[in-house]
Amino acid sequence: MRHYEIVFIVHPDQSEQVPAMIERYKSTITSHGGQIHRVEDWGRRQLAYMIEKLAKAHYVCMNIECDQTTLDELEHAFKFNDAVLRHLIVKMKKAETGPSPMMKEVQREEAKKAAAAQPAEAQA
């Protein structure tokens, strides 16, 4: 089996369905004997360019290990799911299990928001 990194972008109106989509894709992978090494929900982020007149979308990153038939099935699911605006599948040399650079940035932003919220609560 080979290692892959998958990033897909979901329509912002469908953001509440992202956890169900992730579970569906995870069950597809595991039911065919694959493994999931990392799943990161990057949340709603600014797009680099407009896609279908949208400026923001919901990003999800998955690092998996699977065979070609499972990968074909996932790609088919991405293509025929109207909520998925774009997807990218990249073959990796080894499994990535640590947080991605994008996730580190998301964690930094959340830490800043939490730090800003604490002094505001202390003053109230």
Curated annotation (Swiss-Prot):
<dbReference type="InterPro" id="IPR035980">
    <property type="entry name" value="Ribosomal_bS6_sf"/>
</dbReference>
<feature type="region of interest" description="Disordered">
    <location>
        <begin position="96"/>
        <end position="124"/>
    </location>
</feature>
<dbReference type="InterPro" id="IPR014717">
    <property type="entry name" value="Transl_elong_EF1B/ribsomal_bS6"/>
</dbReference>
<dbReference type="InterPro" id="IPR000529">
    <property type="entry name" value="Ribosomal_bS6"/>
</dbReference>
<dbReference type="GO" id="GO:0006412">
    <property type="term" value="P:translation"/>
</dbReference>
<dbReference type="GO" id="GO:0003735">
    <property type="term" value="F:structural constituent of ribosome"/>
</dbReference>
<keyword id="KW-0687">Ribonucleoprotein</keyword>
<keyword id="KW-0694">RNA-binding</keyword>
<comment type="function">
    <text>Binds together with bS18 to 16S ribosomal RNA.</text>
</comment>
<keyword id="KW-0699">rRNA-binding</keyword>
<keyword id="KW-0689">Ribosomal protein</keyword>
<dbReference type="GO" id="GO:0070181">
    <property type="term" value="F:small ribosomal subunit rRNA binding"/>
</dbReference>
<dbReference type="Pfam" id="PF01250">
    <property type="entry name" value="Ribosomal_S6"/>
</dbReference>
<comment type="similarity">
    <text>Belongs to the bacterial ribosomal protein bS6 family.</text>
</comment>
<dbReference type="InterPro" id="IPR020814">
    <property type="entry name" value="Ribosomal_S6_plastid/chlpt"/>
</dbReference>
<protein>
    <recommendedName>
        <fullName>Small ribosomal subunit protein bS6</fullName>
    </recommendedName>
</protein>
<feature type="compositionally biased region" description="Low complexity">
    <location>
        <begin position="114"/>
        <end position="124"/>
    </location>
</feature>
<dbReference type="GO" id="GO:0022627">
    <property type="term" value="C:cytosolic small ribosomal subunit"/>
</dbReference>
